[in-house]
């Protein structure tokens, strides 16, 4: 029989990328119902001894997330460093990275005159995991889901949350897809161990990561 169900993203989203662009981590997409409907689902699953695993996308958010809306208001906004903003170089992007979805991994913001990083679409700005306030906000959100009763998380592209220090160019001319600069970087395990301590330790839960570009020998 069924022992667990993994829900692909059901959070509030404008659906630019099938729900992997989250607008609100603590609201259910209207197409799927309400938070009360979610609580009913979770309760009925647990009555039947079925676990519920949520998809979690914390490499990036939607550009319609409240954090990003605040972040792009000004250079000194308290949420500015929740995302990765950089000055351009000679009127062009901060580096030559391409994204999974677009020729350049950077989009220009006219209002503040800086570029923001998005390893996927321009509708999915990357979160800045070097900012401890961002990490604390993510952990608090995860713990609220655990307190609600969810049994674990499947973590989308979690191996991409740490970028190479200084965001150096990839090797080659033009736009370059450079996973060696944004996948499985030195701080990745530091962040994941901190997450384990803050969210998973002491709980009867599970976690599985989509670890893009990571090989079995890299496991630690």
Task: Describe the function of each predicted region.
Residues 5, 153-155:
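Hydrophobic residues within beta-strands of alpha/beta enzymes
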Residues 1-143, 147, 160-217:
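Acidic/aromatic-lined carbohydrate-recognition and catalytic surfaces
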Residues 148-152:
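A glycine-centered loop/beta-turn motif at secondary-structure junctions
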